[in-house]
């Protein structure tokens, strides 16, 4: 009986001591003995007014931790071993960023707001070749680039086109009329040491540099074809005299790929002026009549062949006179 009473007293005393002891959670950063910590913050757009960015991947590689920001752009990483490291931020459509975390004896750190810069967006890209047939059996080759690019921050400093395989890197010029970044580059002639044909199938990348010096590779395209076959005119030619509505005829073009014609008439003078253009002429056609009367004077006309990728070739010039 005495032994039983002694056991009861011991249990009661032990319970009393346990109730008076402080309850310290080893995972609680407030616990002075804890070696775990937390940090938190927000991710927003650099563009004003700053807006929260949801779904940003926030990674802490020290502990192989990865979370995403919520609808408010908020993140909170808890129960982390306290060791200095780098926190990374990654979101499609935005430039990557990072921040160095130094605990400095802190166990809970407010990292404030990280601002992500939107990556310039390539909406459309056309890269095509142009071959102009000239007399003396010569051909002039031109590489053309047209890029539609938008940037939320409007901080683009330069845009260039690059082909590493060809050691080619040229800057594009913004055309306010077309709202495009463009390049019209004389590549050489048919007999160039490095002909335009070498560019077929190579990747041409669009590179954007912003005002902070950040570089973005925003997309690429390839050259599909260089049209070397020559389209030949039939009449009028060689300065023949015609009326004000001449019938323009050419020899049927059979290149083995889909295409359309474009016809242009220019004044024949030191500074030629375009007086008439007809586009989207069906590939089976071999003649066209201008839908406007030409004034008395000297002219020449050319035939363009344009494939489905905008690659094109121009005939030699055919001259005529209107009387």
Stretches found by the model and what they are:
Residues 14-42, 47, 95, 108:
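Bacterial Sec-dependent N-terminal signal peptides
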Residues 39, 47-62, 155-159:
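Short, ordered, surface-exposed loop/turn motifs in non-cytosolic proteins
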Residues 41, 69-77, 114, 179-181:
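Glycine-centered loop-to-beta-strand initiation motif
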Residues 54, 63-74:
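Short, acidic Ser/Thr/Gly-rich low-complexity loop/linker segments typical of extracellular
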Residues 76-84, 92-93:
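Short Pro-Gly-centered beta-turn/loop motif in secreted/extracellular proteins
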Residues 88-104:
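A short, solvent-exposed loop/turn motif at the edges and junctions
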Residues 145-155, 210, 252-257, 307:
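Extracellular acidic, Ser/Thr/Pro-rich low-complexity tracts
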